[in-house]
């Protein structure tokens, strides 16, 4: 009886000790693993792979509590990453490269598009089969608009006389309306975003010139980190990229399923057909090299893009490649 009582007392003391310790452990883990991925723009179909990872619990399975949040432009998000006010961003690698060249302490840790899905569209009665067809056309140009910034190299590569293109400067918010009302002949778009939306509004099938098929390969979607956060939380970054890659794999295997998963999280509902097309354009452009993790980066891709950015004046100084990207967090 006395021995049994002593065993109960010892066991009880152990339970008290465990109960005193246990509550602090999950609290610490939760605080360390709660992260926000800040998109550089409003929610759209090209973000679907990340919402697949969220919807299927892949982030949770890695011990992460992830919030996927809208942004208000790449420059704003990159500055927040650099200051430490945001930890992870998702947006164009080209924008990250410009930020690094300006001295911001950020880095691309996964590259999901080696060829940004950009295109130029026209109405059916406006011929547009090759870059040469841009000559004699009215093209909408806006400040900070990627294709407009790269028009010079694109024309040079394809032997197009840029002076024969009528470039009409306008506010970015007016571009679509100007195109739909035929004030301009051709409009640059992201095939994974505006193209299906504008085509749905117009009710016609546009002619599409895919710029990557004509030599202009710009790095696209990527995961970007603030350097300090990545250095201090390497395991968190690795877990996030591992779960995101699973979301990408599932989206590639089932684009329509990915669109349905994305639809659950949209504050403003999108037409299902438009969302399907946005996701499809995203997955076909995904960087999934054989034998490498999804998001793996090659030096040659970065060198070519940095040279192009230097040529166009988008960056003034080239830094070592290691300043722009790393594969260290990919598994």
What are these regions (language model features)?
Residues 30, 231, 330-331:
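Short, solvent-exposed mixed-charge patches
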Residues 16-27:
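C-terminal segment of classical bacterial N-terminal signal peptides
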Residues 94, 174-178, 182-268:
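Pocket-lining segment of extracytoplasmic ligand-binding domains
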Residues 231-312:
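Secondary-structure end/capping motifs
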Residues 162-166, 268-279, 315-323:
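Short, surface-exposed acidic
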Residues 29-181, 185-192, 209-211, 217:
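Short, glycine-/small- and polar/acidic-enriched structural segments
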Residues 1-10:
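N-terminal export leaders
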Residues 302-331:
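Conserved C-terminal helix/tail region of periplasmic/extracytoplasmic solute-binding proteins
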């Amino acid at each position: 009886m006395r021995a049994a009582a002593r065993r109960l007392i010892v066991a009880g003391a152990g339970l008290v000790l465990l109960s005193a310790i246990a509550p602090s452990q999950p609290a610490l883990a939760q605080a360390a693993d709660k992260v926000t991925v800040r998109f550089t723009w409003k929610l759209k179909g090209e973000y679907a792979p990340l919402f697949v990872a969220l919807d299927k619990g892949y982030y949770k399975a890695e011990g992460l509590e992830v919030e996927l949040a809208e942004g208000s432009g790449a420059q704003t998000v990159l500055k927040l990453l650099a200051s430490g006010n945001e930890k992870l961003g998702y947006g164009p690698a080209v924008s990250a490269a410009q930020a690094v060249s300006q001295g911001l302490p950020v880095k691309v840790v996964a590259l999901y598009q080696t060829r940004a899905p950009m295109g130029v569209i026209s109405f059916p009665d406006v011929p547009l089969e090759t870059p040469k067809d841009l000559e004699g056309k009215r093209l909408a140009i806006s400040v900070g608009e990627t294709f407009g910034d790269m028009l010079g190299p694109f024309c040079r590569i394809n032997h197009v006389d840029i002076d024969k293109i009528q470039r009409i400067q306008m506010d970015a918010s007016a571009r679509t309306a100007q195109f739909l009302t035929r004030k301009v002949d051709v409009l640059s778009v992201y095939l994974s975003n505006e193209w299906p939306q504008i085509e749905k509004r117009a009710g016609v099938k546009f002619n599409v010139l895919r710029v990557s098929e004509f030599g202009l390969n710009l790095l696209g979607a990527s995961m970007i980190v603030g350097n300090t956060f990545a250095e201090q939380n390497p395991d968190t970054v690795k877990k996030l990229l591992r779960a995101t890659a699973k979301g990408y794999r599932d989206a590639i295997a089932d684009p329509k399923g990915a669109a349905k998963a994305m639809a659950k999280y949209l504050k403003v509902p999108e037409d299902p057909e438009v969302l399907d097309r946005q996701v499809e354009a995203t997955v076909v452009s995904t960087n999934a090299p054989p034998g490498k993790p999804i998001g793996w980066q090659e030096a040659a891709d970065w060198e070519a893009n940095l040279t192009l950015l230097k040529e166009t004046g988008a960056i003034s100084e080239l830094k070592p490649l290691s300043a722009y990207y790393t594969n260290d967090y990919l598994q």
